[in-house]
A protein has these predicted regions:
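Short, charged/polar connector segments at secondary-structure boundaries
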Residues: 1-77, 81
Length: 81
């Protein structure tokens, strides 16, 4: 897979996924991102003009908390559940 950069605003987080958010984990990852940058890309799948988060909710939310406009992603071919 090739690492790509996507606009955070173009990534949709499913409601079920949002329910699993742990703010403490987001804060820990944000601190790590400040020190080391984003270490692991998130996974997204294409859905028309937008992208849907497959994996990496806490990394995505940490990037948002830091005011980032883009994030490293891997575009995967995943099916809806």
């Amino acid at each position: 897979m090739k690492r790509e950069t996507f606009a955070i605003a173009d990534i949709y987080v499913p409601i079920k996924r949002r329910a699993t958010l742990d703010q403490k984990r987001v804060d820990e990852i944000a601190t790590s991102m400040l020190d080391k940058g984003q270490q692991a890309p998130i996974l997204v799948r294409a859905d028309g003009a937008r992208f849907v988060l497959v994996e990496g909710l806490h990394r995505l939310e940490a990037a948002k908390a830091l005011g980032e406009k883009t994030i490293f992603c891997f575009l995967v071919d995943a099916r809806r559940h």
